[in-house]
Amino acid sequence: MTKSELIAALAARYPQLAARDTDYAVKTMLDAMTQALASGQRIEIRGFGSFSLSQRSPRIGRNPKSGEQVLVPGKQVPHFKAGKELRERVDLVGNDQGDDSSNGSSDPLQSVMDMHAMH
């Protein structure tokens, strides 16, 4: 599901909200999460998962054009760890669909909403 598809699914699910408001809400949430991670904060969404930063160590890489070895510097990268409820929900949905779980027939937004309703 892309960001545009998420916005469209939310707008369809909540017709009382203007599409531009849904678009603004999703973009604002993603911007806030990006800013929090960029400032080194950890984000925890109970029942869904957590976002944090992981440190990648410097390493020796290879320039694909010249074959020359180059030093690739260390860097911070975002990391997502799914929460227990999300893992269980995904496993449950995957088992219900059998081998056809990649056909896109399920409604991912509905799955998230159902998971949230379990609280």
From Swiss-Prot:
Keywords: DNA recombination, DNA-binding, Transcription, Transcription regulation, Translation regulation
Protein name: Integration host factor subunit beta
Chain positions covered by the region annotation Disordered: 91-119
Role of this protein: This protein is one of the two subunits of integration host factor, a specific DNA-binding protein that functions in genetic recombination as well as in transcriptional and translational control.
One Gene Ontology cellular component: cytosol
Listed GO MF terms: DNA binding; structural constituent of chromatin
Cystine crosslinks: none
Bias kind Low complexity: ranges: 94-107
GO biological process per UniProt: DNA recombination; regulation of DNA-templated transcription; regulation of translation
Pfam families assigned to the protein according to its UniProt record, in alphabetical order: Bac_DNA_binding
Oligomeric and partner information: Heterodimer of an alpha and a beta chain.
Phylogenetic placement of the source organism: Bacteria, Pseudomonadati, Pseudomonadota, Betaproteobacteria, Burkholderiales
Gene this protein is translated from: ihfB
UniProt superkingdom: Bacteria
Organism (species): Bordetella parapertussis (strain 12822 / ATCC BAA-587 / NCTC 13253)
Family to which this protein belongs: Belongs to the bacterial histone-like protein family.
InterPro entries cross-referenced by the UniProt entry: Hist_DNA-bd, IHF-like_DNA-bd_dom_sf, IHF_beta
Alphabetized HAMAP family for the sequence: IHF_beta (MF_00381)
